[in-house]
Amino acid sequence: MQKIEKPWGYEIIWAKTDKYVAKFLHINPNSRLSLQYHVNKEETIYVMSGQLRLQLGDESQESTVGPGGIVHVSPGKVHRFGAGDSFVMLCEVSTPELDDVVRLQDDYKR
C-alpha cells in the first residue's frame, strides 16, 4: 500500500496492476479536488462515508452522493469531488493512467 498526501486530504493506493488501480480517497472537511477531466482514464467511485459533493460538467450540476452511492466518470467528462462540513471517504477503481489529469480549475494552484 502507498499513502500519498494531497492538499485536500490523502489517497491510499491498495492495488495497482497494468489493467487497473484501486485506491481510497480521504477528502478533508470543506476541501475539494480540482475541476478536471481525463483523456483516457475511466473511474468508478464508491462513497464509503460522508456526503460527497459532486460536480459533473458545469457548476449548476452539483449534487450530493451519500454512503453506498456509486459514480462512474468516463474519459473526457469534466468532474470535481468535494466534502462539506465533515470528511468524505471514497473507494476508486480506475484504469491505470494515474497521471492522466487535465486540471481546469484548482484551489491549490497546481
Predicted segment positions?
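A short, N-terminal "cap"/entry segment at the start of jelly-roll beta-barrel domains
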Residues: 1-23, 34, 103-110
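Double-stranded beta-helix
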Residues: 4-6, 80-110
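Conserved short histidine dyad/triad with adjacent acidic residue
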Residues: 23-40
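Glycine- and acidic-residue-biased ligand/ion/polar-headgroup-sensing regions
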Residues: 40-53
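Short acidic-glycine-tyrosine-enriched beta hairpin
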Residues: 58-78
